[in-house]
């Protein structure tokens, strides 16, 4: 019996946390005076939700095969992503063999070049691609990582992103990455507060625990150089992440030349496709690239990005993304550790990143996840049936 074909594609929106992890209630650390490109405007400085960071919502993509198997994924994209899936991308999927993932990716990308390339369109293509890998692996009754060549290590080790690296150390993580709170618009006083925060956290975690700083595209080269130099020399900061606009490749190259020896410059969370990462790598912009598999083009594109980085001798440490990253990282020698996003409001406990949208999502125990915890078919997670799905652009089955 041959491989089934794709029978139908469906796209839904969901509100409230999950894949759009910024869509949280009040009092969550992830929305507490964090430096952003909008920090130059005082009225948008205190809360990231104030400028609309959570407007997209979650995109859920379901792909049903002719044998009844359903693959799915979640990413950011919301109503806009649903429109792109149902009105444009579905034509390249329905009727295709489930194994033709490379061809489907190329058709989706090529057909959207005139309005896509990055942003919401690549987010959406990423979501479709992840659902295709989930579907194929379920049909083959294998985990996605088996389709990618299998594990190269027995467990994943994690650093934690959140407001409390001191608690992350107690939970067994290898390091902690904090959000930057004050942007250049807050002048010297803000810079001093940033350095005080890093110094205070260093005193709590000790000298051997990794401390990193997530700047979320909020700085300029001069400020980032001053911050990185002082934080490295005074407090042993391991890396400075996404300090500049993702479009400023020249600035990243300059920043990397400027920082102290041993200080790492990392970026790539908001970069997309092999062509974007080619610029980062060839221009010497960073030491570690951090593609988000739900935003950079999916697994199909992340394979190419990772191979490109490997040829340049650079590490790939994907941004967040839970199981969608785990199944990839466990198969790659140049991805020696992974990120875990602390989604508890106070960053004081380990909870699933995509809660409440996904069920059976594994979480680190003592900062680790065994490879065997990823052995269920597909990505090993289920969509929570209690979540209210909305399909804004329904179609008849092909």
From Swiss-Prot:
Entry note: cofactor: Binds 1 Mg(2+) ion per subunit.
Residues that hold Mg(2+) according to the record:
214, 241, 269
What does it catalyze? L-rhamnonate = 2-dehydro-3-deoxy-L-rhamnonate + H2O
Q: Tell me which residues bind substrate.
A: 22, 48, 339
Q: What class of enzyme is it?
A: lyase
Quote the catalytic residue positions. Answer: 319 (proton acceptor)
Quote the EC number.
4.2.1.90
Q: Which Pfam families match?
A: MR_MLE_C, MR_MLE_N
Note the PROSITE patterns from the entry.
MR_MLE_1
The domain of life is: Bacteria
Q: Does Transferase appear among the keywords?
A: no
Spell out the residues of the site Increases basicity of active site His. Answer: 292
Thylakoid keyword on record:
no
* NCBIfam families documented for this protein: PRK15440.1
Q: Misc remark for this entry?
A: Reaction proceeds via a syn dehydration.
Its assembly, as annotated, is: Homooctamer; tetramer of dimers.
Q: What does this protein do?
A: Catalyzes the dehydration of L-rhamnonate to 2-keto-3-deoxy-L-rhamnonate (KDR).
Q: What name does this protein carry?
A: L-rhamnonate dehydratase
What organism does the record attribute this protein to?
Answer: Verminephrobacter eiseniae (strain EF01-2)
């Amino acid at each position: 019996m041959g491989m089934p074909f794709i029978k139908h594609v469906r796209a839904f929106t969901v509100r409230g946390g999950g894949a759009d992890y910024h869509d949280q209630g009040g009092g969550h650390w992830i929305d507490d005076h964090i430096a952003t490109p909008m920090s130059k405007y005082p009225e948008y400085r205190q809360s990231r939700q104030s400028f609309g960071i959570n407007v997209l919502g979650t995109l859920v993509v379901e792909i049903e095969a002719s044998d009844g198997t359903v693959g799915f994924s979640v990413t950011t994209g919301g109503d806009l992503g649903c429109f792109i899936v149902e009105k444009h991308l579905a034509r390249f999927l329905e009727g295709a063999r489930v194994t033709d993932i490379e061809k489907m990716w190329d058709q989706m990308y090529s057909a959207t070049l005139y309005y896509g390339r990055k942003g919401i369109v690549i987010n959406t293509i990423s979501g479709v691609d992840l659902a295709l890998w989930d579907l194929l692996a379920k049909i083959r009754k294998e985990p996605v990582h088996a389709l990618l060549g299998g594990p190269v290590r027995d467990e994943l080790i994690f650093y934690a992103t959140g407001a409390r690296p001191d608690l992350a150390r107690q939970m067994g993580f290898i390091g902690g990455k904090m959000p930057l709170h004050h942007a250049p618009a807050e002048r010297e006083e803000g810079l001093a507060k940033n350095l005080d925060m890093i110094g205070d956290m260093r005193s709590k975690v000790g000298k051997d625990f990794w401390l990193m700083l997530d700047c979320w595209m909020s700085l300029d080269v001069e400020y980032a150089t001053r911050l990185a130099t002082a934080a490295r020399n005074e407090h042993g900061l391991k890396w400075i992440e996404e300090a500049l606009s993702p479009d400023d490749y020249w600035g990243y190259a300059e920043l990397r030349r400027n920082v102290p020896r041993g200080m790492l410059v990392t970026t790539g969370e908001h970069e997309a496709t092999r062509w974007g990462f080619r610029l980062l790598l060839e221009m010497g912009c960073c030491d570690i690239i951090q593609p988000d598999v739900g935003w950079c083009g999916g697994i199909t594109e992340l394979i190419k990005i990772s191979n490109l980085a490997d040829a340049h001798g650079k590490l790939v440490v994907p941004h967040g993304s839970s199981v969608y990253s785990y199944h990839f990282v466990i198969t790659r020698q140049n991805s020696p550790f992974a990120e875990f996003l602390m989604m508890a409001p106070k960053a004081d406990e380990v909870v699933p990143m995509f809660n409440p949208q996904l069920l059976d999502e594994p979480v680190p125990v003592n900062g680790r996840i065994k490879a065997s915890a990823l052995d269920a078919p597909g990505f090993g997670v289920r969509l929570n049936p209690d979540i209210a799905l909305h399909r804004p652009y329904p179609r008849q089955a092909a």
